[in-house]
Amino acid sequence: YTTLFRSSIIVERFGADTLRLYEMFLGPVEQSKPWDTNGIDGVHRFLKKFWGLFYDRQDNYLATDEVPNAAELKAVHKLIKKVTGDIETFSYNTSISAFMICVNELTSLKCSKKVVLEQIVACLAPFTPHICEELWEMLGHNTSVCDAQWPQYNEEYLKEESVNYTVSFNGKARYNKEFPIDADNDTIQKEVIADERSEKWMEGKQIVKVIIVPKKLINIVLK
């Protein structure tokens, strides 16, 4: 009875979607979990951030018909793949983590493109049906989001095109640099040595050797 009472208070304050999402976020469904509402604010902030992809703080509608770029497509298709697999194994908590990561990425990219938002809404609807039903209608649909086709991910959008290397001098990390995923060691070495950020660490010193750990690290040994 106490838990039901607390639940009704949460619904009144945060809404039913926040409660649903929070309960699924607590951990694997097969495990018993103590009732704890300490993290519910974070879940509510996520939903507000998600809403922020559709409307700004002045309540201006943001969704556009623009074509998404590679980074935006990668973010949403990575999400679709993760959630599709997680739902099959009832791993709802990790799905919600994936939603949070995706929304953070799209917020950073300032992405409010309908084709991207539609797919997220369709994926999120089983978790938060009320807000998703409203957003689905705002995106121009006359039917319920419950009748929407489940999005399909495309592996082509998930391919890594570049790799982020940590550049170190005598074992101490100094900066990071992106390289095409197919860049060879000679190209990587030449570009790092020519990078203006390397100058102050190499000034007055001699290169003994360059160690390249594929897709991870470049260490320039100096004396």
What spans do the regions from the language model cover?
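Cysteine/selenocysteine-centered motifs that mediate thiol-based redox chemistry or coordinate metal-sulfur cofactors
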Residues: 200-223
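Helix-rich, typically C-terminal accessory recognition domains appended to large enzymatic cores
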Residues: 9-178, 211-217
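A short, contiguous, amphipathic alpha-helix enriched in charged residues
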Residues: 182-202
